[in-house]
Amino acid sequence: MIDSSKKQQQGFPEILTAGDFEPLKEKECLEGSNQKSLKEVLQLRLQQRRTREQLVDQGIMPPLKSPAAFHEQIKSLERARTENFLKHKIRSRPDRSELVRMHILEETFAEPSLQATQMKLKRARLADDLNEKIAQRPGPMELVEKNILPVDSSVKEAIIGVGKEDYPHTQGDFSFDEDSSDALSPDQPASQESQGSAASPSEPKVSESPSPVTTNTPAQFASVSPTVPEFLKTPPTADQPPPRPAAPVLPTNTVSSAKPGPALVKQSHPKNPNDKHRSKKCKDPKPRVKKLKYHQYIPPDQKGEKNEPQMDSNYARLLQQQQLFLQLQILSQQKQHYNYQTILPAPFKPLNDKNSNSGNSALNNATPNTPRQNTSTPVRKPGPLPSSLDDLKVSELKTELKLRGLPVSGTKPDLIERLKPYQEVNSSGLAAGGIVAVSSSAIVTSNPEVTVALPVTTLHNTVTSSVSTLKAELPPTGTSNATRVENVHSPLPISPSPSEQSSLSTDDTNMADTFTEIMTMMSPSQFLSSSPLRMTNNEDSLSPTSSTLSNLELDAAEKDRKLQEKEKQIEELKRKLEQEQKLVEVLKMQLEVEKRGQQQRPLEAQPSAPGHSVKSDQKHGSLGSSIKDEASLPDCSSSRQPIPVASHAVGQPVSTGGQTLVAKKAVVIKQEVPVGQAEQQSVVSQFYVSSQGQPPPAVVAQPQALLTTQTAQLLLPVSIQGSSVTSVQLPVGSLKLQTSPQAGMQTQPQIATAAQIPTAALASGLAPTVPQTQDTFPQHVLSQPQQVRKVFTNSASSNTVLPYQRHPAPAVQQPFINKASNSVLQSRNAPLPSLQNGPNTPNKPSSPPPPQQFVVQHSLFGSPVAKTKDPPRYEEAIKQTRSTQAPLPEISNAHSQQMDDLFDILIKSGEISLPIKEEPSPISKMRPVTASITTMPVNTVVSRPPPQVQMAPPVSLEPMGSLSASLENQLEAFLDGTLPSANEIPPLQSSSEDREPFSLIEDLQNDLLSHSGMLDHSHSPMETSETQFAAGTPCLSLDLSDSNLDNMEWLDITMPNSSSGLTPLSTTAPSMFSADFLDPQDLPLPWD
């Protein structure tokens, strides 16, 4: 500070004398900055200065305790002692000659070149010794054998076996290695290119070391040569991208050999200096074949490959051991996950990660399809590359390159450039491919082309072109197949797959098993191809090579055994599939009968037509492929929206478990796409579609979708006229509304949902009642299919509803869950009280049509699926219902023992998948295929407004015109993501508070029975809704959009007047949440 001020003072005279003030200003600025820096320095010095104690200890400051004179004396003594010590050292220092001899001083009279040579020799000797030690250090395999490296026992056994096979010959010979490596020089581009990249290090040496050392080498090489040829044979293919299919065939052996090439090349670079030193050292008498040319220019693109000196065999052996060691570790890890992966399609990411780690370089090159082949070793493929390669470390990039048989030398940008093509392929193909392989549902998703569930098959065909075909083709055309698959997949919507993936991964392994069964049922060929098949293919293709490769042989028995197991599993799955198909046929027959009955009843021809199409679709759904055809049905076709299907495909993965379970009837979803009724019919497909952003008619999700999801039967017993109860059964294949025969006919239209065939339900004890109702229903169902689907609006007449609601008031108190255990029959028996689900109907007498809200709780799947349908013919259905009577909605938990048994059977048979949750979109979230059947709020028509019945899942039955329009718009918005995600969507709430929570759909696992208390609260619908949420059970709430219903507090959503209907598709917001529900009041519903 002082100095700077002094400087300033000194500077002033100059500046002032010059009379130039500009420099003065500049100088002031400079000085100011100097002062600042000086301040900082001073601050630092002050902070870092030694304490007085330290200064005292170092003799710099006198201690406070002792007098200053004493301190000075001590200091002088110290100095004297130091001086004496230095003088002594100077006297005893060695002579110059001695220093020269010790190379501390240079000889003035000697030639400088000689000295330099001596120094070089000395350094070279040191380097050579070090190199020798390094070259002869034990490799990881040897360390493992000697128990120096701790490894998993299985890996150790494999390593010991492999090590004995591959490396016995080279392990003992270290002398010739150096020579051969020395002999090799960048001058040998031709030989090295072939060898360096593809050949194992040992071979080049064999051919290129015609040195005296070969005396010992020949024998060694003779023994080594057998392995070398094998390595050389496969590695070239592995290394070269074109033959990648072959490379994939190479199992770990190939990989190891192939990798060694690039790896060796890369590592040889660092070693070059050492090699040079060795040659200079001339410690060996052998003649040098070639001297390294230091001036030779090696272009960067060739550096890692052609003109690099080959690694000495010792180093190569080390590298190979390391690679083998890593591969064996990966293999052991893969084996641990082997079964899980093949069966579990869900965890794509894990698989990919493993793949990326796996040492199958060639396989990776193969393409997403080969990945599966790749998995020959395990069930893995070179994992898909992350979106940004820059984030990867160099070591990770090199690992990826090795997996793909690419050179690993070069800078990070070079590595990234090499990996980019694979990144693109993987991003599109692998995501799709992985999905496809992963699960039929995923495949379905990927297959937008097949609008229906067919996608699975189609995808499958593209991917594997049939199980058998894949097997046959894979070895030769595995790559092409893979490529095709990639192409097919890449266009496919990948986004759904991630959600599916996540949902699947979250599921239990059991779920995965059931899922695989489902997939198999859906299309055995596809399932096979999806995982086991590919494995089989890979292993088959590998087998030829593996026979040649010694390393492969180690795993051959294991692989064979696994393959056999997989084949057995496939056979079992096929048998199950056949059984399921037979069952489907029977159900289809039943459906046919029902359909005919329904057709006969021409209640409102149009509605019936939709219902019919739905039914046919359902049947076809069971068929799977036929579904698509069914979709072609006039109604279906018109209603069918390819987009919905496509979205369904996407969404389907979620439901796939359920849908496929639905008995391959999942495809039914498609059938339900018929436009008018299609909306409802689109059921699952539309449901999913809508979730995917398609605005299927108002149907957000269809009961069927739920049904597909759950084999659980939704029994929405709607008591029509109080006497008849409509039970909606969402059997595996379809959702069915069953109305008691009594009011069945009139109510049936409402129940039109009958369109859903209770395939599973029929099969189960429910079946008997269903048939009766179905016959009556079918007509109505057909006529009303949309309505029914929408809301199973039983008791369409608002008048009826009001009284109904009044009745239910007490009923509501009953746990809306009449214990799922109560059979559907039970619910039928107590139709009037069944209003239990109808929340506080009594409170809402004023609002004539609080639609009855039927909540069917499907405990089966943890996630309830909510579906909203706009029944185009809703008004007609309402009319019918009104004419019929005011049916009392009865919410039955079709959760009787029969149902439990049925679910168990279905799950075992794979018809129903355990909770498979997919969140392709908020809607799909709402109705995670978790086989929870959305409660179809059997909101009977809200008589005043055109029945605004909303399926508990956001099913809103609004006046057809306004509702459908608003529903579509809102659906679009919802699909587009304007709606909060399913988890965020609050139960539909009507600000008029005149809505009743229709019901919760709970996972069968969480029986709503436990929540019967919530039903008791039904008097205050809002409470009910919240309690349900609190229970954490997915709640399907039906919004009856009658603002007339003042009592429905639970619906916070402001509903326009009854006439406007539920324009806000708040109902659309999936009512079903797999788990946490936000406080309804906190959830913003973006429906306008």
Curated annotation (Swiss-Prot):
Species annotation: Homo sapiens
UniProt domain comment: The N-terminal region is required for nuclear localization and the C-terminal region mediates transcriptional activity.
Subcellular location: Nucleus
UniProt region (Required for interaction with itself and with MRTFA), positions on chain: 563-591
Site (Breakpoint for translocation to form ZFTA-MRTFB fusion protein): residue numbering on this chain: 394
Short name of any one Pfam family annotated for the protein: RPEL
Basic and acidic residues bias (residue ranges): 272-287, 867-879
Residue ranges of coiled coil: 545-601
UniProt entry keywords in alphabetical sequence: Activator, Chromosomal rearrangement, Coiled coil, Developmental protein, Differentiation, Glycoprotein, Isopeptide bond, Myogenesis, Nucleus, Phosphoprotein, Repeat, Transcription, Transcription regulation, Ubl conjugation
Composition skew (Pro residues), residue ranges: 238-248
Matching PROSITE patterns: RPEL (PS51073), SAP (PS50800)
Assembly with partners or alone: Interacts with MRTFA and SRF.
Compositionally biased residues, Polar residues: 214-226, 367-378, 528-540, 829-838
Residue span, SAP domain: 389-423
GO annotation (BP), single: smooth muscle cell differentiation
Name of the molecule in the record: Myocardin-related transcription factor B
Phosphoserine modified-residue sites: 66, 541, 543, 921
